[in-house]
Amino acid sequence: DGEAYRTGFFLGDGTGAGKGRQAAACILDQWLRGNRRHIWISKNAPLLEDAQRDWTAIGGLPADILELSRWKIGEEIPAPEGIRFVPYGTLRSSRVEDTRLDQIVRWAGSDFEGVIVFDAAHEMGGVAGGEGALGQKEGSLQGIAGVLLQNTLPRARVLYASATGASDVNNLAYAVRLGLWGPGTA
């Protein structure tokens, strides 16, 4: 589409190694540079507490991280700064008139250069669809939503964090910012 996309980074440390703390540190680096709009996507809503724990452990305030579901789909997010926590299930949700993806993109703005953390990034596996045991299967909705978010915010600083990454190379199709395929790759 003619956009220059910022390259992403994959954090593949094992379970319990502190990937959440490292993700929080990436956000804090930008926060201290005055860039105060970030998106933290994770497996489910209860992990908000883990994100807040990691953020506060390095000096942030719990109130800096707010879950997107505090606002109804389609409602404008009034807080101009902060970290929006979005479970994958919320990211893919929609109503006839609007989607959560559109809502978070409007909040971020077209000039967004914040960090997008895809915690448990393997949850976006299967985005490309393919052949399943029972025939052709469609791509996963949350994987598609994750790729659309990356494509819509080309200047975002994308961090994929997962202890498992992918069980099959096709399940890395969500990691579009790694430069694994496409023009200019080997």
What are these regions (language model features)?
Residues A4-D13, R36, P154-R157:
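Pre-Walker A (Motif I) flank of P-loop NTPase domains
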Residues Y5-C26, S162:
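Walker A/P-loop
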Residues F9-F10, R84-V86, I116, L159:
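Hydrophobic positions in the central parallel beta-sheet of the AAA+
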Residues K19-Q22, C26-E67, Y88-T90, G165-N171:
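Conserved Walker A/P-loop ATP-binding site and its immediately adjacent core
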Residues A25-D29, R33, P46, T90-A186:
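Signature of the SF2 helicase/ATPase Hel1-core->accessory helical subdomain module
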Residues G59-R100:
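Inter-Walker segment of RecA-like/P-loop motor cores
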